[in-house]
């Protein structure tokens, strides 16, 4: 990644921005930990949790302040070091800011606090911090970072002479496809069709894990690769057949690759293995739930070069390169994001198989002829959320309670779709009758387990209904009893001391305390030990 500092800005305006020029031993303990993490991800921007903020230091602070138009300040980094550049964002907004950086082609690392800061403070040491997320343009699953009606593809390539293998996946939906062919011009056109958010490419260079933003170049990239994409340069090792083949077999619990039709496609297997290794490297504790790779052949589809797609205005117009006015804009009357993404794929990759084309036409004709059936389908589909991405987040362990409710609501509608399909003649629609009955049971279980309006964030608690789990009910009862005990204590102490405004509170520093306003402090009994003095109150503990 190139140095994003504006060329017109004199380097002396950013003293200590380059941490490589500093004596590490003289840095504060926190700054030393920051640099330990930074050196593991030298080509990413590092957000480092400090209290209620995520802070960035050194050159990252300069870059982030410039790209996000944030205020840049400084922070003490050690007595003999002085101050270094610093930029910070509130912890609750870190993903919103990260999304903007990802759109600009950066990778972002989130290093969060993994223990209670009060515990570390009590033991007089630094709070433990670990990398919890590595965000790159091709590995996003959060809805607010994705375009609902467009796939977010991560692609991986292996090139050997004129032959090439390609694997690409949308980890937000689980789609995973591979292909292999000859002719580098076809590779260029396939990439232009897919418009991947990120492309992995193995190189023989010491500076691996480097990320090239759109428009940047590198001597390691062959001329056939369009420079309009974001490229992550990776080590050759995970792209070798010796590592890639067993990784693919293990990931999908296969005994051979014949079952997915790629035993004879070594370059595509290597690309798939490299992609899986990258997900292992970036997703940390979040598992990635991908479907088994689907092998396809370019000759099964009409190949449209980039110029033809542009002239035909399939997804964007020639005039201003926007969706409005394009063929996709005119045709996309779909009722779900899933349908919109599928329509985009169909337009960009037209079938050549006559049987498949007729099957699609027959389905459309049935909807045209049967107004009531069409209306019933539309009404039901409008009540179904983005099942592909909902199940993707569940599989990736990133779903929240709202996602689970949306998933259950959507699954509960599928039996009604299956019932509608009984009236249909088209094989496409008839296939809906084969929906597993277990889906309805899953929806019922979710609805019966969650409260009616669960909080969005899992850490808030209060998600599970009473009666679902006996141990949880017992713990909840104990917590409720504790709250009642505190309320009773407050009433008791008010009566004993004659202080009607006395309160019982809690903080992480010294636990439960008794609060008395400064004006009533002289009424505090002898068995109250003062622990803290504030502007308007005194805080005590009972001895």
What positions do the PLM features span?
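Basic, polar low-complexity surface loops/patches
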Residues: 1-372, 379, 389-392, 396, ...
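Extended, amphipathic alpha-helices with heptad-repeat/coiled-coil or helix-bundle character
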Residues: 136, 385-395, 502-516
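Amphipathic heptad-repeat alpha-helical coiled-coil/stalk segments that mediate oligomerization
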Residues: 239-246, 303, 318, 405, ...
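Active-site lining segments that contact anionic ligands and/or coordinate catalytic metals
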Residues: 309, 499, 511
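Secondary-structure capping and boundary motifs in well-ordered enzyme cores
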Residues: 323, 335, 356, 376-386, ...
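Acidic, serine/threonine- and proline-rich low-complexity regulatory regions
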Residues: 394-395, 490-502
